[in-house]
Amino acid sequence: MEEKLNDLKEQGIDWAFANGLIMIKKPTEEEAKNNVVNVTHVPFSLYPSKMNKKLFNEACKLAEDYNLLVHNISKDYDFLQNTLKDVFDDFTQMLLNIQRKVVKEGIKQKISLGIFRSDYMFHNKIEGEEERIYQVELNTISSSLAVVSNRVFNLHKYLIGRNDLNDNGYDLLNHPTNQSDKEISDSIALAHKLYNKEKSSVVLMIIQEGERNIYDQKGLEFQLWSNHSIKLIRRTMKEINQCAKLDEENGSVLIVDGMEISVAYYRAGYTPNDYTSSGGDEWKARLLIERSLAIKCPTIAHHLVGVKKIQQVLAQPGVLEKFINNDKESLQRVKRSFTGLYSLSKEDIDMSVVKEAIESPQNYVMKPQREGGGNNIYNDQVAIALKSMSSEELSSYILMDKIMSKSFKTHVVRDRQLLEIEGLYELGIYSVFISNGDDDIVLNKQAGILLRTKTANSDEVGVAAGFGLLDSPILE
């Protein structure tokens, strides 16, 4: 058995390097000083993980529901501003300020592109209780890993077929197709064609400095060119502030290094760490893009819908109905996906829930308003934070019931090492959405799958952040 697993490991590593399932390793100080770049495979499971088919399909069905929900909320300027005005978080307040400015000036571009990902965990706290899915979070900006997720699905198909594992419980008929890379690049291409002001325009990908997950991003760039003959350029926000301008005579066209931008696609800008210049260069770039005619992915409104406070407020009685008011089935599906979500803002904090969380912190998670992995508070730290933070500090978090999943044994490969772990997984469903103004919906569809597995004793699951690894499901 061990010999077979090692053989699978070597086959998997070779396939990963040959097919772009790779990322840049974090450099040592010496390597950084000498500009040495080392590449490794993205951590992956050796074979697919078993998953409840009914719940998988339920998660996929929710994709279009959440797309419409994000769209409807993004149209309600007053709801976003009023709901988030008391969030004690400078980052969120800066986003709100940009929205106020561009709405006052008048939105230049009616077309918007959304590339979203809704993440779910499978809840089964009590033995014998029916398993169900709960939403962990909804990502409305920089929904990454679509390219490498496609690769790990193909890796598993290769390993199963190559090693005759179909009879070992890994029937490829139960292994879903995942074209997340193509679906997302196609949506960017469609937005580019809708812009269609100048045939020589290009797509702008806004990136972080020192990006290690570059090959996931490059995969989209290559697909845009090979499938659609569309050029993509990459710039950091600091670079954009230096080299971008608006051509006011032509309706606020965004020009970067002399090139007209059709779509501004953010793979950065979701964390305060992306806005560090003392002169506010990155915030100036964000405002410039938002003021422009370029199609934004996301718009500032779409970004704000992803703030955790919105997730918490939607779970309150009567709120969701304002935004899903003509489809009872959709309303019930979305409601069913909500776990317990509680405000920590001083205006509406529920002290009985806070007291319970202090007494049983292992049953709760504190989540900050912003996106990006590694910022949540778990276990005993929840009680410490609730007791020590000021009311202003608490308002920058929400409290959430911890989703309890059953763990399973699996074999994984990280840094060329074969490991047996007790794992848990998180299922992400990509979706794409294009609207031309408030009421003209051009595209609304599910756009692929991301399955990330982590060790059962790990709280976070981010792959780029170093917590999780890529997986794929076998449905049963």
Swiss-Prot record:
One Gene Ontology CC term in the entry: cytosol
Cofactor(s) listed: Mg(2+)
Any one Pfam family match given in the protein's UniProt record, by short name: GSH_synth_ATP
Family annotation (NCBIfam families): glut_syn_euk
Database matches in InterPro entries: Glutathione_synthase (IPR005615), Glutathione_synthase_a-hlx (IPR014042), Glutathione_synthase_C_euk (IPR014709), Glutathione_synthase_N_euk (IPR014049), GSH-S_sub-bd_sf (IPR037013), GSH_synth_subst-bd (IPR004887), PreATP-grasp_dom_sf (IPR016185)
Name of protein: Glutathione synthetase
Cofactor note: Binds 1 Mg(2+) ion per subunit.
Organism: Dictyostelium discoideum
Subunit structure: Homodimer.
